[in-house]
């Protein structure tokens, strides 16, 4: 090799050596390098789950989740009825559940199954994220042993999606199908919620709540709480339906679809906000005729949209308040409240359709828009009542038409 060839080879080796000395091995992770999780797809029947409606699958599903905890995991659930005993299934981030048609998670004998979204740290990033349920069916029953139920207990969760899911007779008597505490970016769409046999009639299928142990469907050991409110929830194009018996009468009312009924530490960490309840159908929920209740109830909320929904009574003869918004805090302001373009068919409340109240009438709600609603009824009942003046320039109430 001549002189120039030797020099070029020496120079190249020296440069590579310097680069490796400064940056380390190119195969080793660097301080600012983001490590991608591997993608894994599994079929649950190949991993020990049995869809024979006899075998309990709690341990098998938890084993899958624990074993693949560091993966971007897709879980395919073939057709079958997968039985679950009472207990908890703890999730991790980055899971997609895909259910085949005819695939059902079922529980019975008064058991409650909790899907736990843990939050080992406080703050909006303290929990898990990127969970999708696609086409899932959760089925319970109501027997002499009690109400069997599934609960999604979501604490500081974010980017959680339920699409084309079905929840059948599986709401906790004192709880919820989906329980959101200090969570955000939640998308619930194209799904059906059937039946509610509550011992607390005001409970909602979808609870919008705060990060507080009192609020939880399941108190996961080690979770950290901070009273942060849930925000940015979209509930779109869902159905909330009753169960009828063979004679066509109601055997289980439809769930109250959505709401919130508590606030913690006077809302110092913020209040519930940016909630969208749109294009849904609610049929025959239980009449809530006592003062302070409503089939859709929010306290201390802002940026609320209840729009383009169908509220229908077929077998229920009469309701109480249907939508109830209440400011229970003297100093907090509720603003940007929209109830628009909904239809109310045979609701016939014993009081009014919409009730707005404030614990301090001198602190009314602001930027309220209640317009374009259609009421079909044979009875003359007030559409809106409040305990403060509705003549504020920021309150718009118009084009709410009654049809007999």
What do these predicted regions represent?
Residues 2-27:
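Sec-dependent N-terminal signal peptides of Gram-positive bacterial secreted proteins and lipoproteins
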Residues 48, 58, 70-114, 138:
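N-terminal extracellular ligand-recognition/capping segment immediately after the signal peptide
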Residues 59, 65-66, 91-93, 364, ...:
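Extended beta-solenoid/beta-helix repeat architectures
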Residues 65-71, 90-91, 127, 154-155:
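Flexible, charged surface loops at secondary-structure boundaries
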Residues 99-103, 126-140, 158-169, 184-197, ...:
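Right-handed parallel beta-helix
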